């Protein structure tokens, strides 16, 4: 009971969690062990859940142009803090991976008067709508003048989720969890429409002077302290008078020659630093194939448990949904903020063809122990199921490997600099929490290899996220406060 109380309190307040161990994490992967993990999504799978307890829910539409190397995403984030404060944000990124200095725009805009209708999301000057047939989304946003978005996303393959219930639960009772994590996917889609951006134009002659002024201002701010707020306001007023010049640009993805998209709906029903200590996300697209990986590792409070979802598709079908994946960070070096950041990445997906049904994986002898004790029957049934699974899986295996460099950094995002102050105060109270997201875009060097076949070249987007330091489990590890 004490653990349950502590878990419930910490899940909503952000306090450091005690040691629970693996019995308090109910992985979606465990529920589909020795079964077919793939389930096709329905329209209802993409209804917003929006519960009244602490959670963060989001939809994110990634796009990548195989020809131009332009990457990006449009995202709506809906959050609820302790049931007291609800907020929504629209974030947008566009990046030219072949000419990074020419186009790299990021906007994040607070939404007003937002509301949810099933799978649809609305706010002032924004709408995200799922078609009645569940085949396409239409995203329109003019909430920020710097990034006006009008995109259509159409499924090229079925949607994908792990099992009938694609959620991982936290707590001692799976029926009454104190936290959860859920993902549903459209792994490969066509994206057409327009993106109108305003790119800030900085005269070359002013760049060095501007940089020097920024350094001087930082020094002055440190010396003046909080007592000179009035002076700071005057400086801010002066800076606002500086005229900023923008270059208008329109990026168009044609319906007959679309960009390729990956769409994900995510739900996180607890504080971010309690749910996971690290994340790996990647999508790979080529003319004929796609691969998607979403993986997180829990904090030591939940025994550093890894939960991994992988998807391999061709241009029409989902080939495999995998939970047995290996992410290798290669040639890593500690950077200026203290994280061990990889220079290359290798991801191995292991699973079975989606055409294999659960019935084929069930042992024919699973119901023949009627006269045996319950425990003995259960043990024998598990052994037989595992053996049967191995036999069928070997005949229908899908093993895919994605490899690529992480040398084209889009941005290193300081999460603490992006989240609202009331959330920041909660998260920063936990020692060792310093969340950073590293985003990379590779326009040509990444490869996908399926079942030892030829290596297929394509584009890849990778996000490596570090949240808290907790590699080794010990008694001291659980005393983070």
UniProtKB/Swiss-Prot annotation:
Residues 203-245, 373-388 have a biased composition (Acidic residues). Disruption phenotype: Leads to an increase in cellular ceramide levels and a decrease in complex sphingolipid levels. Mildly decreases cellular phytosphingosine (PHS) levels, with no increase in dihydrosphingosine (DHS) levels. Sensitive to Auroebasidin A (IPC synthase inhibitor). Simultaneous knockout of NVJ2 to leads to myriocin sensitivity (sphingosine biosynthesis inhibitor). Simultaneous knockout of SUR2 leads to a growth defect. One of its GO terms (biological process) is ER to Golgi ceramide transport. It is found in: Golgi apparatus, cis-Golgi network membrane; Endoplasmic reticulum membrane; Cytoplasm; Nucleus. Residues 197-251, 358-389 are annotated as: Disordered. One of its GO terms (molecular function) is ceramide binding. One of its GO terms (cellular component) is endoplasmic reticulum membrane. It comes from the Eukaryota. The keyword Protease does not apply. InterPro entries: Ceramide-binding_SVF1, Svf1-like_C, Svf1-like_N. Residues 1-18 are annotated as: Peripherally associates with membranes. The keyword Endoplasmic reticulum applies. Keywords: Cytoplasm, Endoplasmic reticulum, Golgi apparatus, Lipid transport, Membrane, Nucleus, Transport. It is a peripheral membrane protein. Acetylated at the N-terminus in a NatC complex-dependent manner, which is required for membrane targeting. Present with 45200 molecules/cell in log phase SD medium. Belongs to the SVF1 family. This is Ceramide-binding protein SVF1. It comes from Saccharomyces cerevisiae (strain ATCC 204508 / S288c). The lineage of its organism: Eukaryota, Fungi, Dikarya, Ascomycota, Saccharomycotina.
């Amino acid at each position: 009971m004490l653990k349950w109380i502590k878990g419930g309190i910490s899940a909503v307040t952000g306090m450091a969690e005690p040691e629970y161990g693996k019995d308090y994490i109910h992985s979606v992967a465990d529920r589909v062990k020795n079964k077919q993990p793939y389930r096709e999504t329905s329209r209802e799978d993409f209804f917003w859940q929006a519960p009244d307890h602490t959670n963060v829910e989001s939809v994110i539409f990634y796009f990548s142009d195989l020809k131009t190397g332009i990457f990006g995403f449009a995202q709506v984030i809906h959050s609820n803090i302790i049931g007291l404060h609800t907020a929504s944000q629209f974030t947008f990124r566009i990046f030219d991976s072949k000419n990074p200095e020419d186009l790299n725009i990021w906007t994040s805009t607070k939404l007003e008067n937002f509301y949810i209708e099933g799978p649809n999301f609305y706010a002032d000057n924004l709408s995200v709508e799922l078609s009645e047939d569940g085949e396409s989304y239409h995203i329109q946003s003019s909430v920020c003048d710097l990034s006006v978005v009008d995109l259509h996303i159409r499924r090229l393959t079925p949607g994908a989720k792990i099992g009938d219930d694609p959620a991982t639960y936290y707590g001692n009772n799976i029926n009454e969890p104190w936290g959860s994590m859920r993902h549903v996917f459209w792994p490969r889609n066509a994206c057409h429409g327009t993106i109108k951006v305003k790119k800030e134009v900085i005269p070359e002659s002013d760049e060095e002077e501007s940089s020097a002024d920024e350094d001087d201002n930082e020094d002055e701010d440190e010396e003046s302290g909080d007592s000179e707020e009035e002076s700071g306001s005057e400086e801010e007023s002066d800076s606002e008078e500086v005229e900023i010049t923008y270059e208008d640009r329109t990026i168009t993805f044609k319906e007959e020659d679309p960009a390729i998209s990956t769409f994900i709906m995510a739900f996180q029903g607890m504080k971010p630093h309690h749910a996971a200590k690290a994340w790996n996300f990647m999508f790979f697209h080529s003319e004929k194939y796609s691969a998607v990986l979403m993986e997180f590792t829990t904090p030591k409070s939940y025994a550093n448990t890894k939960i991994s979802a992988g998807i391999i598709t061709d241009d029409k079908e989902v080939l495999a949904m995998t939970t047995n994946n290996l992410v290798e960070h290669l040639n890593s070096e500690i950077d200026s903020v203290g994280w061990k950041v990889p220079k290359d990445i290798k991801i191995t997906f292991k699973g079975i063809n989606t055409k294999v049904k659960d019935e084929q994986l069930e042992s024919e002898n699973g119901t023949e122990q009627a006269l045996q004790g319950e425990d003995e029957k259960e043990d024998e049934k598990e052994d037989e199921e595992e053996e049967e699974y191995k036999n069928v899986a070997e005949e229908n295996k899908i093993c895919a490997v994605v490899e690529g460099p992480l040398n084209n950094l889009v941005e290193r995002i300081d999460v603490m600099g992006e989240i609202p102050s009331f959330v920041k105060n909660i998260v920063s109270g936990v020692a060792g929490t310093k969340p950073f997201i590293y985003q990379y875009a590779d326009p040509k060097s990444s490869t996908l290899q399926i079942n030892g076949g030829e290596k297929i070249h394509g584009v890849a987007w990778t996000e490596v996220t570090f949240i808290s330091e907790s590699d080794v489990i010990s008694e001291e590890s659980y005393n983070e406060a």
